[in-house]
UniProtKB/Swiss-Prot annotation:
Catalytic activity entry: Xaa-L-Pro dipeptide + H2O = an L-alpha-amino acid + L-proline
Sites where the protein binds Mn(2+) 2: 246, 257, 423
Matches recorded under Pfam families: PepQ_N (PF21216), Peptidase_M24 (PF00557)
Single biological process term from Gene Ontology: proteolysis
EC number: 3.4.13.9
Cofactor requirements of the protein: Mn(2+)
Entry protein name: Xaa-Pro dipeptidase
Organism of derivation: Erwinia tasmaniensis (strain DSM 17950 / CFBP 7177 / CIP 109463 / NCPPB 4357 / Et1/99)
SUPFAM superfamilies: Creatinase/aminopeptidase
Family affiliation: Belongs to the peptidase M24B family. Bacterial-type prolidase subfamily.
Cofactor: binding comment: Binds 2 manganese ions per subunit.
Length: 443
C-alpha cells in the first residue's frame, strides 16, 4: 500500500488541477479559503464548538483551529497562515509537523487581524471561500467574489470523486466507528441507559460529543421511530425490546456514518425482521455498479421493503408492485436510501449533474432522497434502508382506502420497537463495490 505521504501528495496534485480549472473558467488568479471563526453565544462570553469550513479541510487536515487561511492559485505550493497566538487562557495548537506539511507552505499567524497585511495586496481577481462574508468584506473583497456560486458548484461537484488519500481517511473513520458500535452493543446488552450507551460509544472512539460528525442517535424501544432521535434518556427502560444506533466517527476531517438495529430477544418477530432487512440491504448493495443512477437503488429498495412487509404479513392481499405504485411502502421508509459521504456526512452535490451546477431533484414520490447522481468510480455513499412504525405517518393509511390491507394489530405490536435501520458505507469502483463497513465485520 502507498504511504500516507504519497497518498497526500497525489491528493494535493488532484486538488491543484481542479483549482487550475476553476480559476481559469472564472478568470480568477487565486482562491482564499478561510477555516472559519469562533461564534460567540448571544449575550454570553462563551463560544459555540468550532466547525471548520469543509472546503478548507479538503486541503489540509486542520479541523480544530479557527482564523486559518489558505491561498490557492493552482500552480504554487498552497500557502497556509496557521493561527497560533500567544494565549494563556486557551490551548494553542503548535505549528503542525506531520505527513502533510511538506506539501504546504506554513506561516504562523500570531494575531487574527494580521491577515489583512499579510495577504497579497492584489485581491481583485481572488475568490473568498468561507463562512464569514463580513470578514471578506473587511479584507476588500467585493460581493461577487465572496463564495461565487460557479466556483462553489465546481468544487462541490468534484468532491464526489474521492482521491486515494480520501478513501484511506474514510476507511480509518470506519475503523473508529466500528469500535464504537461494538462498545455500544455491549452496553445495550448490559442494560445501560441511552445516555450511558452514548458514553460507552464516545469512550471507545476517543471522541467528545462535539467531535463526532453528527449527533449520535442512541434509541431504545419506541424511540427508534424518531428518525433523528438525540434526546438520550438517563434512565434505562423497564423493559428492553430494541436498540437502534446511528453513530459515526471522524478521521482527518472525513466521516463515517453507520447504523445498526438490535433485538433484546432473538426469538421475537422484530429480530427476524432485522435479519431479513439485513439480507435485503446486502443484496441491494451487491447489485450496485457504475453507470446507474442512485435513484434506481432507492426505488429497488422500496420493492424489497414491500416484499418484507408481505413476508411478515404486516400488509396482505396486494402485490409488491401495487404497494410501491400506491406508495404503501412510503410510511414505513420515509427517508432516502442514503447519501454521499465524505468531508461532510451528507456530502455536497448529491443533485448536481455536472460541474456547472445542473440540478436534478429527487423524484416527486421520494422528496427526501439526497442523491440523484449517476454512480461513477471514486464515489462514496451510504446505503441505509429502514422500516419504522411511526404513528403520524401511518394514521392517514389507517383511515384510508387501503386500510383493510394492513394488519394493524401486528403493526401496533411492533410500534413498541420503534423501527429498524441498517446502514453501510460503500465505495464505487470501476468493476466492483467495496463495503467498507462489512469489511470490518460489523454484522
Amino acid at each position: 500500500m502507498e504511504s500516507l505521504v504519497t497518498l497526500y501528495q497525489e491528493h494535493i496534485k488532484t486538488l491543484q488541477q481542479r483549482a487550475q480549472q476553476v480559476l481559469a473558467r472564472h478568470s480568477l488568479d487565486a482562491m482564499l479559503i478561510h477555516s472559519g471563526e469562533l461564534l460567540t453565544v448571544f449575550l454570553d462570553d462563551h463560544t459555540y464548538p468550532f466547525k471548520v469550513n469543509p472546503q478548507f479541510k479538503a486541503w489540509v487536515p486542520v479541523t480544530q483551529v479557527p482564523n486559518c487561511w489558505l491561498w490557492i492559485d493552482g500552480v504554487n505550493k498552497p500557502k497556509l497562515w496557521f493561527y497560533s497566538p500567544v494565549d494563556y487562557w486557551h490551548d494553542v495548537e503548535p505549528l503542525p509537523q506531520s505527513f502533510w506539511t511538506g506539501e504546504i507552505d506554513i506561516v504562523p499567524l500570531k494575531n487574527a487581524d494580521d491577515i489583512a497585511r499579510l495577504l497579497p495586496t492584489q485581491r481583485q481577481n481572488v475568490a473568498y471561500i468561507g463562512p464569514v462574508p463580513a470578514r471578506a468584506t473587511q479584507l476588500g473583497f467585493n460581493t461577487e467574489a465572496i463564495n461565487p456560486p460557479g466556483v462553489i458548484d465546481f468544487l462541490h461537484y468534484h468532491r464526489a470523486y474521492k482521491t486515494g488519500y480520501e478513501l484511506y481517511c474514510l476507511r480509518q473513520a470506519q475503523v473508529i466507528a466500528v469500535t464504537g458500535h461494538r462498545a455500544a452493543k455491549e452496553a445495550f446488552k448490559s442494560r445501560l441507559s441511552e445516555f450511558d450507551i452514548n458514553v460507552a460509544y464516545l469512550s471507545a472512539t476517543g471522541h467528545r460529543d462535539t467531535d463526532v460528525p453528527y449527533g449520535n442517535i442512541i434509541a431504545l424501544n419506541e424511540h427508534a421511530a424518531v428518525l433523528h432521535y438525540t434526546k438520550l434518556d438517563q434512565q434505562p427502560p423497564e423493559k428492553r425490546r430494541s436498540f437502534l444506533i446511528d453513530a459515526g466517527a471522524e478521521y482527518q476531517g472525513y466521516a463515517a456514518d453507520l447504523t445498526r438495529s438490535y433485538a433484546a430477544s432473538e426469538g421475537s418477530d422484530y429480530a427476524q425482521l432485522i435479519k431479513d432487512m439485513n439480507k435485503e440491504e446486502l443484496e441491494l448493495i451487491a447489485t450496485m455498479k457504475t453507470g446507474v443512477r442512485y435513484t434506481e437503488y432507492h426505488q429497488q429498495m422500496h420493492y424489497r421493503i414491500a416484499s418484507l412487509l408481505l413476508k411478515h404479513q404486516l400488509v396482505n392481499g396486494l402485490t409488491a408492485e401495487a404497494m410501491v405504485k400506491e406508495n404503501l411502502t412510503g410510511p414505513f421508509m420515509p427517508h432516502g436510501i442514503g447519501h454521499s459521504l465524505g468531508l461532510q456526512v451528507h456530502d455536497v452535490a448529491g443533485f448536481m449533474q455536472d460541474d456547472r451546477g445542473t440540478h436534478l431533484a429527487a423524484p416527486q414520490q421520494y422528496p427526501y432522497l439526497r442523491c440523484t447522481r449517476v454512480l461513477e468510480p471514486g464515489m462514496v455513499l451510504t446505503i441505509e434502508p429502514g422500516i419504522y412504525f411511526i404513528d403520524s405517518l401511518l394514521a392517514p393509511w389507517r383511515a384510508g382506502k387501503f386500510s383493510q390491507y394492513f394488519d394493524w394489530a401486528k403493526i401496533d405490536e411492533l410500534k413498541a420497537y420503534g423501527g429498524i435501520r441498517i446502514e453501510d458505507n460503500v465505495v464505487i469502483h470501476k468493476n466492483s463495490v467495496e463495503n467498507m463497513t462489512r469489511d470490518l465485520h460489523l454484522a
